[in-house]
Amino acid sequence: MAGENHQWQGSILYNMLMSAKQTRAAPEAPETRLVDQCWGCSCGDEPGVGREGLLGGRNVALLYRCCFCGKDHPRQGSILYSMLTSAKQTYATPKAPEATLGPCWGCSCGSDPGVGRTGLPGGRPVALLYRCCFCGEDHPRQGSILYSLLTSAKQTHVAPAAPEARPGGAWWDRSYFAQKPGGREALPGGRATALLYRCCFCGEDHPQQGSTLYCMPTSTNQAQAAPEERPRAPWWDASSGALRPVALKNPQVVCEAASAGLLKTLRFVKYLPCFQVLPLDQQLVLVRNCWASLLMLELAQDRLQFETVEVSEPSMLQKILTTRRRETGGNEPLPVPTLQPHLAPPAEARKVPSASQVQAIKCFLSKCWSLNISTKEYAYLKGTVLFNRDVPGLQCVKYIQGLQWGTQQILSEHTRMTHQGPHDRFIELNSALFLLRFINANVIAELFFRPIIGTVSMDDMMLEMLCTKI
């Protein structure tokens, strides 16, 4: 057919059919191509049957027409085919690891080798390389930072070494592994091991029971450090002398000022229209409950200042004799019993104000003075204290609750109009009322009124002042 003149010879269809025939000679030395490799297909990745060589033993190179660029390429010569087959694992002889400046934050896709891939049949060690799905480079198995972070919680057994001196002391980490896990105290060969754990605070490995929190003494039997100079105890601490009895330095002047303040307080309460409509028994219930708090607000408004001095406490024998004489009328001689020093009654039972109780009064006065409370604000605060629905024995609870709520609303509107600033004036005023909970009414009576009224009860005084015209 080739030696004959065909009518279709020279046509495009004839040339395409003839170009598919493989009529190539023995391969010659490949020439240098200036153009880049084609991103072609892998249409010639497998040679045809019987096409690997000629009958004469001459080696041939099978060329295929690329369906992308139209040129002839040897089999498996396209970049696309190389990319598709690059994910296969390649076995190579392990070499010395090179210094890596920045390991890839890749995945652990090659963390575990496949079955039967741990070594070659000849016993030669192999290094498994995997194409990282993050950076596209080949890494040995377990060589990514992400895999190291995920497996950093595993316990590593290393030989114990002498601990190095840390300049900043032990880290304040947690001793999650204070007890050694079973079966991990030593290796099978009898070598001692040290369990290291990744600290959840600083990210470093510390030996077990090496944290500062764990090393703190947990019992009184542990050795204590050298005693240092401790700061002075606060005023509410009993060891600082806060329970020592005190008295007014100028009782005559202070007691007269306190009595005048009590009269003004009762006059303010008695002539309130909303208070006058209440029955006398309900008025007495309210006044007996809050007279001390109302007096403290009045003393803060009058800016009463006082000083106290420490008094000598009577001996235990004198207290016992005085108590027995009051009970028996002082007619019978009393034996002297023996009491232990730790059985002494507290300061409230002795009816002698202590230093801590007086300090609570001074703290409230200082708080009110620091706020610069006006006359109207003092009046609203007194109304809030007076109309308390939680008083035991109160019958008209809803009426008192409405009065307290109305007083708070008026105070809130007043502070909003007079104080326009970043701080909430209403909250600051109510915080001052919170300090009244730490003041005892019996302490106020003993400190300011006992030198004047003697043994008269304060409840009787409240009843007399409500019934008489002030």
UniProtKB/Swiss-Prot annotation:
A Pfam family recorded for this sequence: Hormone_recep
Keyword Transcription regulation: yes
Sequence repeats: 1-67, 68-133, 134-200, 201-253
Region described as 4 X 67 AA tandem repeats: spans on this chain: 1-253
CC terms in the record's Gene Ontology section: cytoplasm; membrane; nucleoplasm; nucleus; ribosome
Domain spans labelled NR LBD: 215-469
Main location: nucleus
Locations listed in the record: Nucleus; Cytoplasm
Keywords: Cytoplasm, Nucleus, Receptor, Repeat, Repressor, Transcription, Transcription regulation
Short motif LXXLL motif 1, span: 13-17
Record InterPro entries: NHR-like_dom_sf, NR0B1/2, Nucl_hrmn_rcpt_lig-bd, Nuclear_hrmn_rcpt, Nuclear_receptor_repeat
SUPFAM superfamilies named among the record's database cross-references: Nuclear receptor ligand-binding domain (SSF48508)
Gene3D superfamilies: Retinoid X Receptor
Motif (LXXLL motif 2): 80-84
GO biological process, one term: protein localization
GO MF entry, a single one: protein homodimerization activity
Domain of life where this protein originates: Eukaryota
Recorded domain comment: Homodimerization involved an interaction between amino and carboxy termini involving LXXLL motifs and steroid binding domain (AF-2 motif). Heterodimerizes with NR5A1 and NROB2 through its N-terminal LXXLL motifs.
Record's subunit section: Homodimer. Interacts with NR5A1, NR5A2, NR0B2 and with COPS2. Interacts with ESRRB; represses ESRRB activity at the GATA6 promoter.
Similarity field: Belongs to the nuclear hormone receptor family. NR0 subfamily.
Primary role: Nuclear receptor that lacks a DNA-binding domain and acts as a corepressor that inhibits the transcriptional activity of other nuclear receptors through heterodimeric interactions. Component of a cascade required for the development of the hypothalamic-pituitary-adrenal-gonadal axis. May also have a role in the development of the embryo and in the maintenance of embryonic stem cell pluripotency.
Name of the protein described by the UniProt record: Nuclear receptor subfamily 0 group B member 1
